[in-house]
């Protein structure tokens, strides 16, 4: 929808597409968080967690915090692609899946290995990564709006 509006050079439709796309994404992710937080045992059963059930439930509760920001990041990526921002989309993807998460999980694991923190600290790498990527994504969105959307006649 946003790409179509961009092709039409319709600022209002682009802005509406971004606005409603993000609103729907946030609403859906909040529902996902609620379901995961309320019924983590059901997910453990789905994945046949067995003896690792408690670890699985703990991990799901921490990781579900990242759902909201992950959803926003995926929406940002779609917005960037629709507005000819493939590089920005790629950067967010790399931040989320490689550049932030791997070093952060490695650093967190050092604290766990040294006995300073529990195993759940490693799972916090997911929400922290998503929040950082979301902040970078917001900066990219402002830049794209300024340079591509607001310049439309």
What are these model-derived regions, one by one?
Residues 1-38, 72-84, 88-89:
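Small-residue-rich hydrophobic transmembrane alpha-helices
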Residues 25, 60-63, 67, 93-94, ...:
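Residue-level recognition of transmembrane alpha-helices
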Residues 28, 32, 36, 66, ...:
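Alpha-helical transmembrane segments of multipass membrane proteins
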Residues 31-53, 57:
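Short membrane-interface helical motifs at transmembrane helix boundaries
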Residues 36, 78, 104-109, 137-141:
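Structural signal for membrane-spanning alpha-helices in multi-pass inner-membrane proteins
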Residues 45, 87, 97-135, 145:
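Membrane-interface helix-loop junctions in multi-pass transport and translocation proteins
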Residues 51-76:
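Alpha-helical transmembrane segments of multi-pass membrane proteins
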Residues 146-153:
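Intrinsic disorder in cytosolic terminal tails and internal cytosolic loops
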């Amino acid at each position: 929808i946003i790409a179509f509006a961009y092709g039409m050079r319709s600022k209002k439709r682009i802005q509406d597409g971004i606005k409603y796309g993000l609103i729907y994404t946030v609403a859906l992710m909040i529902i996902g968080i609620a379901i995961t937080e309320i019924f983590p045992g059901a997910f453990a059963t789905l994945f046949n967690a067995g003896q690792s059930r408690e670890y699985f439930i703990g991990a799901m509760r921490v990781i579900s915090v990242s759902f909201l920001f992950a959803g926003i990041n995926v929406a940002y990526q779609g917005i960037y692609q629709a507005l000819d921002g493939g590089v920005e989309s790629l950067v967010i993807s790399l931040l989320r899946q490689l550049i932030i998460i791997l070093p952060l999980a490695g650093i967190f694991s050092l604290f766990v290995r040294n006995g300073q923190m529990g195993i759940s600290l490693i799972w916090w790498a997911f929400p922290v990564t998503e929040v950082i990527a979301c902040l970078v994504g917001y900066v990219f969105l402002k830049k794209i709006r300024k340079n591509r959307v607001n310049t439309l006649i």
